[in-house]
Amino acid sequence: MAKVIGIDLGTTNSCVAVMDGKNAKVIENSEGARTTPSVVAFTDGGERLVGQPAKRQAVTNPEGTIFAVKRLIGRRFDDPMVEKDKALVPYKIVKGDNGDAWVEEAGKKYSPSQISAMILQKMKETAESYLGEKVEQAVITVPAYFNDAQRQATKDAGKIAGLEVLRIINEPTAAALAYGLDKKDGKTIAVYDLGGGTFDISVLEIGDGVFEVKSTNGDTFLGGEDFDMRLVGYFADEFKKEQGIDLKNDKLALQRLKEAAEKAKIELSSSQQTEINLPFITADQSGPKHLTMKLTRAKFESLVDDLVKRTVEPCKAALKDAGLKAGEIDEVVLVGGMTRMPKIQEVVQSFFGKDPHKGVNPDEVVAMGAAIQGGVLQGDVKDVLLLDVTPLSLGIETLGGVFTRLIERNTTIPTKKSQVFSTADDNQNAVTIRVFQGEREMANDNKLLGQFDLVGIPPAPRGVPQIEVTFDIDANGIVNVSAKDKGTGKEHQIRIQASGGLSDADIEKMVKDAEEHAAEDKKRREGVEARNQAEALIHSTEKSLTEYGDKVSTEEKEQIETAISDLKSVLDSTDTEEVKAKMQKLAEVSMKLGQAMYEASQAATPNTETDTKSDDVVDADFEEINDKKK
């Protein structure tokens, strides 16, 4: 039975795990690392890089390196958060054909789902390499506070990557699964998850295989990226004060500052001070300029103080919704790389009144939980019941633009809820159902998920027709809505296609594109392997020709030299078949040389035997002397 993998598709890093017996195992990638940077790069040579190779070349290719695309997934181009992001990243964020935020590289547009699919493909290949078999099914994690559009876009990314997404699972819930799988006693825990781009807080009751989410809250635009950018701004401002040069307009310099910020942030988790040293960061008429400064932990903490405090309000809201006080939480589990920051741990300790639990790896625990959920769905993990919730209220717009909730936030999913509405005008023969998600009282202040029309309502005075609207949220947190005219029995049902979102045709096209890219990548890899083999063959043949060239005729020697020259001339060719053909030709004409080498080694064999015999005689003498000594 094929394995189901668990993927933590992170803003900064991604991780893949699989069930190995009764335990979840994190799989190392081809570079030997347990997490993979969520970075995709397009080089000038038309090559596509994913993960560490992409991150490594970011400084020299800032506009072609796409990172933190998870912050754009499922968002409209005119979203205020997208506006904010545009000012912070060196790559181009553009308006997609559907009005969503997309990215553009070398004139080609990509949806965030497509970029995410490239990262998921890398995770899929990592798992396939380890398991030695094809992987087709996965459980993928998302921030608990992701809305329907963001969840749907993540599911689309899985489809584009060639994966059947069995379940979309919330990151804190996945972490709780990994933490509590072996816990028998009942506990109330809080999962505080501060990652690269998002923040979640979930309150759960766990015990004896039951994981029940009581409430969840968060901020989908708060994470390590914001801490990094705060440092980038500080470095640039300090440099401007000192040198009078603004680095914020220099994309190459900004990318170097970002790398330095990430490194400084990590170092300050374990030391009180770090040094930033960036030689040749820029230049003016007077010559090259270098950026050198010291940064203390205290200064860093003061720069990001408001970001740290932003995590407290969602914690308060989650506790309130769960009907609990901070003191009633038995354990606080820290998830996400940012929770290694001492200030974060201090705030958590202060708010909950207890030291956080540090027994799980914050970078890996989410992927492990996803793998466990995969095991549950496959039937390999028994006696586990997971009860998750919808993070935001769902409803429709009613008369006067009011948001009428049908499903309240923190309702256990899957769930279904119906309510009867009527017409606002006499003889109204159609109604438009506009579906929103959020917590504001007016519909337009919330996130519009989509809309549809119910037509053919028989003429009647206002308030007489009965229209039943049904919301259905599946276990992935994805919404289906139907509206039915109870008088005629006419029904209209939709899976909420986000007001932007990808159509089935878009997804199909992107799947084909991804498959073509996979074929291209395979072709490119075969080309590299063929060139490596060709260079090795040239090297060994030239060496043999130097040593044994006098053992073949002049004509044969010339044929070999010509074949070597021909093969060298096609080493830079993109035609792999041509390289293979020239290799075959060189191998054929070199056969006589191989024969000469073999004959030469055969001729040397008798001498070797004589040497061996004389060695044996010495050994015998040596042993005999020892016997006499005894």
Swiss-Prot record:
Keywords: ATP-binding, Chaperone, Nucleotide-binding, Phosphoprotein, Stress response. Residues 515-553, 600-630 are annotated as: Disordered. Residues 515-529, 540-553 have a biased composition (Basic and acidic residues). Disulfide bonds: none annotated. It comes from the Bacteria. PROSITE patterns: HSP70_1, HSP70_2, HSP70_3. Coiled coil: none annotated. Pfam families: HSP70. One of its GO terms (molecular function) is unfolded protein binding. Transmembrane segments: none annotated. The modification Phosphothreonine is found at residue 198. Induction: By stress conditions e.g. heat shock. NCBIfam families: PRK00290.1, PRK05183.1, prok_dnaK. Acts as a chaperone. Belongs to the heat shock protein 70 family. This is Chaperone protein DnaK. It comes from Bartonella henselae (strain ATCC 49882 / DSM 28221 / CCUG 30454 / Houston 1) (Rochalimaea henselae).
